[in-house]
């Protein structure tokens, strides 16, 4: 059933594909595969194909899922047209979509390809799954139809050793079920791991088992227990019970000016759930379309914007900060807002700073809930 790799390589050499910066790497990968032979143990089932033998494709029972594929780990600069052309070399495509960030427009590294013929979808999996493009090894599998059993299967993991690789992260979690995607967040400047990652399982029950088995445990190379929890989705109603249990660590204390300012804060004034909900309707300029808006509560009266920049800046790109002040006294009213461009970075900041002790105050940090700000 597999399409010959030499045919795909020849197709890539022709037309506009020849000029693409990563086309040569694709062809080289295919020719290496052809010269070295199949890499999987069962050579009879995968002649001249690139396959991820450690993650066998699982077929679904519905006809739609037999033609609809999900493609993970795509190069950041790959366009939707290039994705369509690559998979169109296998067979006729009904639709193709590269998933992009709703705010920045940047590729999220995965997409969907829907074929006319189920046989072409199967050929695409056998031919292109495991293909290396630039620094990425793409993963091609059947897209799963939506159901309650697969929703909310995305986990947020913090406290990871900075030396842990994405492969090691998957090895740690793979014992609990089939992993769909994984990611470790790195500093955009240094490229060093931030010790935070995401794991998406095939089913929610697998994610639940991973939480039971790994939350609070020390993986190899770790000096402190890791925290494993369901990733917070800003499109859902905020679960304040879960937020109150988010990751805290004595190592997450900020030195320098932030520590000096923290010494000035002396009063702790806890906030009720109803209080947080009632403030969610405040109109913070730019929150609807410029990024993910974060609500920060329990700031001291003399808190200013600089402390929010210093707190949230290490987690990613911050586009705006605002401390809400009393009109008469010009003192902080106890809360403020931070806007970050990237959801993963915003989620990491929330997980790290919710419950963070700033002087004698314990901060409450969550996504700002608003009818006008939807995921």
From Swiss-Prot:
Classification via Pfam families: RRM_1 (PF00076)
Localization in the cell: Cytoplasm; Cytoplasm, Cell cortex
GO-annotated cellular components: cell cortex; ribonucleoprotein complex
Keywords: Cytoplasm, Developmental protein, Repeat, Ribonucleoprotein, RNA-binding
InterPro entries xrefs: ELAD_HU_SF, HuB_RRM2, HuB_RRM3, Hud_Sxl_RNA, Nucleotide-bd_a/b_plait_sf, RBD_domain_sf, RRM_dom
Entry keyword Phosphoprotein: no
Any one Gene Ontology molecular-function term assigned to this protein's record: RNA binding
The RRM domain, residue ranges: 67-145, 153-233, 292-370
Family to which this protein belongs: Belongs to the RRM elav family.
Known function: Binds to poly-U elements and AU-rich elements (AREs) in the 3'-UTR of target mRNAs. Required for the vegetal localization of vg1 mRNA. Probably required for nervous system development.
SUBUNIT field: Part of a ribonucleoprotein (RNP) complex, at least composed of elavl1/elrA and/or elavl2/elrB, igf2bp3/vg1RBP, ddx6/Xp54, ybx2/frgy2, lsm14b/rap55b and, in a subset of RNP complexes, stau1/staufen. Binds RNA as a homooligomer.
Protein's name according to its UniProt entry: ELAV-like protein 2
Organism of origin: Xenopus tropicalis (Western clawed frog)
């Amino acid at each position: 059933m597999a399409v010959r790799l030499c045919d795909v390589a020849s197709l890539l050499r022709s037309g506009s594909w020849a000029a693409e910066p990563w086309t040569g790497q694709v062809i080289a990968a295919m020719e290496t595969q052809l010269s070295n032979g199949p890499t999987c143990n069962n050579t009879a089932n995968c002649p001249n194909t690139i396959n991820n033998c450690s993650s066998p494709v699982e077929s679904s029972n519905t006809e739609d899922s037999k033609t609809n594929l999900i493609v993970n780990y795509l190069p950041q600069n790959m366009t939707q047209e290039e994705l369509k052309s690559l998979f169109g070399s296998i067979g006729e495509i009904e639709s193709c979509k590269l998933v992009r960030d709703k705010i920045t427009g940047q590729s999220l590294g995965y997409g969907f390809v829907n074929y006319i013929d189920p046989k072409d979808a199967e050929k695409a999996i056998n031919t292109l799954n495991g293909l290396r493009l630039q620094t990425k090894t793409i993963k091609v599998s059947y897209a799963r139809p939506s159901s309650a059993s697969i929703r909310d299967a995305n986990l947020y993991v913090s406290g990871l050793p900075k030396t842990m690789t994405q492969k090691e992260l998957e090895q740690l979690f793979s014992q609990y079920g089939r992993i769909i995607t994984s990611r470790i967040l790195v500093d955009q400047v240094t490229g060093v791991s931030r010790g935070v990652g995401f794991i998406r399982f095939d089913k929610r029950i697998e994610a639940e088992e991973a939480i039971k088995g790994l939350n609070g445990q020390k993986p190899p190379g770790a000096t402190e227990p890791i925290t494993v929890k369901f990733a917070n989705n800003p499109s859902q109603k905020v679960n304040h019970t879960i937020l109150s249990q988010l990751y805290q660590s004595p190592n997450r204390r900020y030195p320098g000016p932030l520590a000096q300012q923290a010494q000035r804060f002396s009063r702790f004034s806890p906030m009720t759930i109803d209080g947080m909900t009632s403030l969610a309707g405040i109109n913070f300029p730019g929150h609807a379309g410029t990024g993910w808006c974060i609500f920060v509560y329990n700031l001291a009266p003399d808190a200013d914007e600089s402390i929010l920049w210093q707190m949230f800046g290490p987690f990613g790109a911050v586009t705006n900060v605002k401390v809400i002040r009393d009109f008469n006294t010009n003192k902080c009213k106890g809360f403020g807002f931070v806007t970050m461009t990237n959801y993963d970075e915003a989620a990491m900041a929330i997980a790290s700073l919710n419950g963070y002790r700033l002087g004698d105050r314990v901060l409450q940090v969550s996504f700002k809930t608003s009818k006008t700000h939807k995921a």
